[in-house]
Swiss-Prot record:
Entry GO CC: cytosol
Enzyme Commission number(s) from the entry: 5.4.99.27
Claim: Calcium is one of the keywords in the record: no
Binding-site residues for substrate, renumbered to this chain: F27, N129, F329
Catalytic residues (positions): D80 (nucleophile)
Species name: Pectobacterium carotovorum subsp. carotovorum (strain PC1)
Gene3D superfamilies: TruD, catalytic domain (3.30.2350.20), TruD, insertion domain (3.30.2340.10)
Keyword Signal found: no
Keyword annotations: Isomerase, tRNA processing
InterPro entries: PsdUridine_synth_cat_dom_sf, PsdUridine_synth_TruD, PsdUridine_synth_TruD_CS, PsdUridine_synth_TruD_insert, TruD_catalytic, TruD_insert_sf, TruD_pseudoU_synthase
Role summary: Responsible for synthesis of pseudouridine from uracil-13 in transfer RNAs.
Ranges where the TRUD domain occurs: 155-303
Name of the protein described by the UniProt record: tRNA pseudouridine synthase D
One GO-annotated biological process of the protein: tRNA pseudouridine synthesis
Length: 348
């Protein structure tokens, strides 16, 4: 399900409106690697603050500056162009001196830190991100304030944001054409975008179905449960439901939904039947990820922002700060606050 307007809300549909990203400075993201660089090694880590530049462009410019092939430059995650973001780039430079990045002239970018590390920085190898958002032109301060309290206590649906689906949902449209052999997709990046969009749409559809049935916080027989903050999961057995529900209520466990691929969903019994029914209509996308041998995975149904705080600048503008684990979308938090908000599209 790619249309966010069709997805169910956890706290009911918001009534307030407002704007996000009126300026790049209203959307600030600071990467949290979750570890300290070693200080030595064959990898050069460069922390960059950028505005108006996407991640791939900066990687290309760093490769050119350091006289390296693009494949020698990596990063932990893609960051929005329409924002102020701080992220690390990794340059593989064994036996080479560290370049003097103070001479790098790249509009919209500042090098904040340079160090060495022993291991390559790969996609997903970060703990999370710190966000500072400013919502402007808020129509109802009282409602947004009440929703901020609810979100801090009860979280939000862990939906993939519209960025995942491309401009006007183009990634999904192309994925369906590819699945039906109406187009050929040779570029590796595009294949990855289309497959990710397909799995994300199916995940969103299952999460929305659980919310619609008021089962986002109810353990079903056969549910795939995850220890909070961990990636591994286990299946809920019939004789353990009461104990597992208590652990879920205490915040020790989280219910997961599928990122379908070439393999079983992972759930059993009632939960499996629920997910299969929820995925009705997604046979084309499901067949694509199976055909392309994408590995099945699971992802938490709900997202709990950490270190959440907010301050009103005036009656129509509020600054909201929070931390999210890697792979989560800040716009999924905003979606529970505002009925509609201005946002920037991300395409392939």
């Amino acid at each position: 399900m790619e249309n966010s307007e069709q997805l169910v809300w956890l706290h009911g549909e918001p009534q307030a409106t407002g704007s996000l990203k009126s300026a790049a400075e209203d959307f600030v993201v600071v990467e949290d690697l979750g570890f300290q660089p070693d200080g030595d090694g064959e990898q050069v880590l460069v922390r960059v603050r950028k505005r108006g530049c996407n991640t791939q462009f900066v990687a290309e410019m760093l490769a050119k500056f350091a006289r390296l092939p693009l494949r020698a430059v990596s990063y932990a995650g893609l960051k929005d162009r329409h924002a102020v973001t701080e992220q690390w780039f990794c340059l593989h430079m064994p036996g080479k001196d560290t370049p003097d990045f103070s001479t790098l002239a790249l509009e919209g970018c500042d090098v904040l830190e340079v160090t060495r590390h022993r291991r390559k920085l790969r996609i997903g190898t970060l703990r999370g991100n710190h966000f500072t958002l400013v919502l402007r032109q808020v129509s109802d301060r009282r409602e947004v304030d009440a929703r901020l309290v609810l979100i801090a206590a009860n979280g939000v649906p862990n939906y993939f944001g519209s960025q995942r689906f491309g401009r006007n949902g183009n990634n999904l449209e192309q994925a369906r054409l590819w699945a039906n052999n109406e187009i050929r997709v040779k570029e590796r990046n595009k294949r990855s975008f289309y497959l990710s969009a397909s799995r994300s749409a199916m995940f969103n559809q299952v999460v929305s179905a659980r919310l619609a049935g008021e089962q986002a916080k109810t353990v079903l027989c056969g549910d795939a449960l995850q220890l909070t903050g961990r990636g591994s999961w286990f299946v809920a057995k019939p004789d353990e439901l009461e104990t597992l529900q208590a652990r879920l209520d205490a915040g020790e466990l989280q219910i997961t939904a599928p990122l379908p691929g070439d393999g079983e969903l992972g759930t059993q019994d009632d939960a499996r039947a629920f997910e299969e029914l929820a995925l009705t209509g997604q046979e084309t996308l499901w067949s694509l990820v199976k055909r392309e041998r994408v590995e099945s995975a699971r992802r938490a149904v709900l997202l709990y922002p950490q270190q959440m705080c907010w301050e009103w600048q005036d009656d129509t503008a509020v600054e909201v700060k929070f931390w999210l684990p890697a792979g989560s979308f800040a716009t999924s938090v905003v979606r529970e606050l505002l009925q509609s908000f201005q946002d920037a599209d991300i395409g392939v």
